[in-house]
Amino acid sequence: MDIKRTVLWVVFSFSLLMLWDNYNRYTGKPSIFFDNPTTQAAKPAAATDDGKTAAAPTADVPTSSAHAANATGVPDSVAPTKSEIVTITTDLIKADIDTVGGEIRHLELLTHHESSDSTKDIVLFDSTPPRTYLGQTGLIGGAYPNHKSLFTVRPGPRSLEAGDQVQLVLEAEQNGVKLVKTYTFKRGEYKIDIKHDVINKTAAAINPSLYLQLVRDGSKLNNESMFYSTFTGPAVYSDSDKFQKVTFESIEKGKIEHVVKAESGWIAMVQHYFVSAFVPPANVPREYFTKKLATNLYAVGAIMPMGAVAPGATQSMDATLYSGPQESKRLEAVAPGFELVKDYGWLTIIAKPIFWLMIQIHQLLGNWGWTIVVLTIVIKLAFFPLSAASYRSMAKMKLVTPKMTEIRTKYKGEPQKMNAAMMELYKKEKINPLGGCMPIVIQIPVFISLYWVLLASVEMRNAPWLWISDLASPDTLFGSYMIGSFHLTIGILPILMAISMFIQTKLNPTPPDPIQAKVMMFMPIAFSLMFFFFPAGLVLYWVVNNILSIAQQWTISKKMGIVN
């Protein structure tokens, strides 16, 4: 029996199945294996890529359990007749704050550009149809100022200029309760400090709660690939329950799949490479919530009681808003556990050391492309003994292939006798039929981890290497073409990938089964077509790894007299 070929056949079949499953998820059809977090994006009334906008929210002011009995929503009639957009510009971000609610309605990352158009900045918060992505704060517990109230703006600078920070102060008063929001933007930071001062001008004590809320449509990202899937949606973190992702689909179904009450943590909206998050003050009780606001419009937030505010008194509560790239050092400085938004899959314990090693290599080389090349060499050297054992086993299998063919011919139709003869041959030639598989299986977790590191690292975006201008995008050396609804890019790396895989199949033992032999010949073509859609950084890793594997396997085969 040829166990290695059986394993490869299973791997190939599973790859095709996963490819089909990703295609289903990309086109909005139900997934075979996973929940589809973007199902709602396909609804006609949703904010989709066809230009249709999400319905306006009808009850988007949150309510905590403490105020449920006397909760008062904000009626549409209180909407102000006039609003003003205030733009704040720093060295890293450009933010538009609306005087209606003092909410952030637009935020650009000035040093990160669209892969498809380098003249356009990455936009996170956005209120331009069909997009809806907002950062909102306000008070509940009474008819107090919230994200629907009209704020006035204090005069002041709107850019850093010569300083290291700029502040924007907004004020709103309702029923004798005044809310003062102070946004502080700092040079070199994606963090925005937000101070909330509640001033009680009434004759009685009040007990307001502060809410922090992120609102986003559930539509797919424009640059989402059908060949690999990354998470887009809300996330909640607490010290007790750690990092919890919440799909738009689960919110649509009314499921609560996260911690509700905690003493610490944060809430976020996560997407590939970027994240926006509100971080409440530490050691303050809070309620987390996720909910559907309208068709294809969802919210995640936190509610914190501010305590009793006596007449004439002022109560304050700070919060931090981070809206920017998933750069590990920046994430670690925001809040405990915040680095977990950088999704390395279920092998984080292996992926994090690999990324740390990448950082060290990059500090020496200064180029992410060469970093990938050197990292691949380092990992290949680390697994050299295991790989050598695997290749020696495959070389032995190739040496006895003629004898195996004779046994199959001799005992055709007699599987028990054939298997017994095969076992006797393995014993005589001192061959372990699993010897070529087990060393490879042991390495699989590391290779999967490296895959996720390269896929999740925002550092790859717009990073050049030789002819490649962006390691996070497909190689486009030979052009880019539209085939129906597919955007096909033709590059040299996927072609080199196919060539290297073809050479590897020639070095491996030829499968005795004609069908398996044809499948093994077809695999390089199938995988190269798939890799035309993958980020160049990932394909670069596979090409370098294949070249090193070919060199090692050829050397071992030559020493054993299999190749000339």
Swiss-Prot record:
Keyword Repeat carried by entry: no
Single Gene Ontology BP annotation: protein transport
Disordered: annotated span: 43-76
Membrane protein topology class: Multi-pass membrane protein
Pfam family membership, one: 60KD_IMP
Keywords of this entry: Cell inner membrane, Cell membrane, Chaperone, Membrane, Protein transport, Transmembrane, Transmembrane helix, Transport
InterPro entries: Membr_insert_YidC, Membr_insert_YidC_N, YidC/ALB3/OXA1/COX18, YidC/Oxa/ALB_C, YidC_ALB_C, YidC_periplasmic_sf
Ranges of biased composition (kind: Low complexity): 43-60
GO MF assignments: membrane insertase activity
Main location: membrane
Location within or outside the cell: Cell inner membrane
Membrane-spanning intervals of the chain: 7-24, 293-313, 341-361, 364-384, 438-458, 483-503, 524-544
Transit peptide among keywords: no
GO cellular component, one term: plasma membrane
Family statement: Belongs to the OXA1/ALB3/YidC family. Type 1 subfamily.
Assembly and binders: Interacts with the Sec translocase complex via SecD. Specifically interacts with transmembrane segments of nascent integral membrane proteins during membrane integration.
Job description of the protein: Required for the insertion and/or proper folding and/or complex formation of integral membrane proteins into the membrane. Involved in integration of membrane proteins that insert both dependently and independently of the Sec translocase complex, as well as at least some lipoproteins. Aids folding of multispanning membrane proteins.
The protein, known as: Membrane protein insertase YidC
Native source species: Janthinobacterium sp. (strain Marseille) (Minibacterium massiliensis)
Lineage start: Bacteria, Pseudomonadati, Pseudomonadota, Betaproteobacteria, Burkholderiales
